[in-house]
Structures are given as structure tokens and as C-alpha cells.
């Protein structure tokens, strides 16, 4: 039996349509990793650097778009109201140097559940996907801590960005 609990509280049609788009992309990640694994490649070995690179590039774009490298700016350009609804987020703290957000639902995890991934595969895919968030944080001169993670059996994902001292 799976330890992963991931059911949305809000299920209106528009949210579901947006979530399905995110699920589709998460399914791509799973299929890429699955095919790579069949060829003897370790998912993490290529997934971590590729997705981190994506995060670094997106972080640089977000900084340019928001015209700031403050974590308040990151919240404004990435963790928008629509994103907050889709992932059922609670923004707990947002300052120039600290950003704390709890996610109560993850469409990526839902995609991997639908694909029949094991708990271990879901956790690994999440670790790979989160390299993007780590890369974004790095672009902002911040570190991301993830003390709780839906993909690992927790009830929420706790994203804790803080500027490097």
C-alpha cells in the first residue's frame, strides 16, 4: 500500500484542466527516466543536472521579469495566485530574504500515481523535479530546504527558501 497521500481539495473544471497539463509534463519526465533506465542509465545521474539547469535558466528569467532577486520578487513571478490555486498553496512568509510556502496538492505526484509508479519511483521523480526549484533558488542567491514532501508520504510539501548568508 502506498504511503503517498495526494488528493485535491478544490476540483473545479478550470483547475482540473490546468492540473492535467502539468500531469502531462510530469508523465513525460517519468517516461524519459523509464526509457533511460531501460538503457542502463541512472535516473538521478542525468535528471538532476538537466532539471537544475532548467531551474537556473528559469530563475534568471524570473529575476529579469521581476526586476529583482529578492524572494518577494520570486513569489510575485512564480508563486502567483493561479499557481497557488492549482497546487493549493499557503504562503506562510514572504520577505526579501525568506519565502515559506506549503503545498497541499501536487499534480506531478498525481501523474506519477496514475502511471503506476512505486513510492520509491515517485520520491525519485520528485527529487529530480525539485532540482528545478533548487536551481531557481540558486539563481536568486538562495537555498531551498524541503522538510516535508508529499512524494515521500508527508501531508504537504514545505518549500523553505532562504538567502545564503
What is the predicted function of each stretch?
Residues 1-127, 143-157, 162-165:
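N-terminal accessory segment detector
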Residues 125-137:
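A conserved amphipathic terminal alpha-helix motif
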Amino acid at each position: 500500500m502506498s504511503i503517498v497521500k495526494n488528493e485535491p481539495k478544490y476540483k473545479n473544471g478550470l483547475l482540473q484542466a490546468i492540473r492535467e497539463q502539468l500531469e502531462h509534463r510530469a508523465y513525460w519526465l517519468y517516461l524519459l527516466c523509464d526509457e533511460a533506465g531501460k538503457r542502463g542509465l541512472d535516473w538521478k545521474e542525468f535528471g538532476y543536472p538537466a532539471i537544475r539547469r532548467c531551474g537556473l535558466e528559469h530563475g534568471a528569467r524570473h529575476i529579469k521579469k521581476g526586476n529583482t532577486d529578492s524572494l518577494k520578487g520570486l513569489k510575485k513571478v512564480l508563486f502567483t495566485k493561479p499557481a497557488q490555486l492549482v497546487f493549493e498553496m499557503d504562503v506562510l512568509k514572504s520577505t526579501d530574504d525568506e519565502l515559506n510556502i506549503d503545498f497541499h496538492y501536487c499534480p506531478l505526484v498525481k501523474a506519477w500515481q496514475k502511471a503506476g509508479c512505486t513510492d520509491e519511483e515517485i520520491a525519485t521523480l520528485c527529487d529530480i523535479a525539485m532540482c528545478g526549484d533548487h536551481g531557481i533558488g540558486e539563481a536568486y542567491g538562495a537555498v531551498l530546504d524541503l522538510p516535508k514532501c508529499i512524494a515521500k508520504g508527508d501531508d504537504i510539501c514545505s518549500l523553505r527558501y532562504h538567502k545564503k548568508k
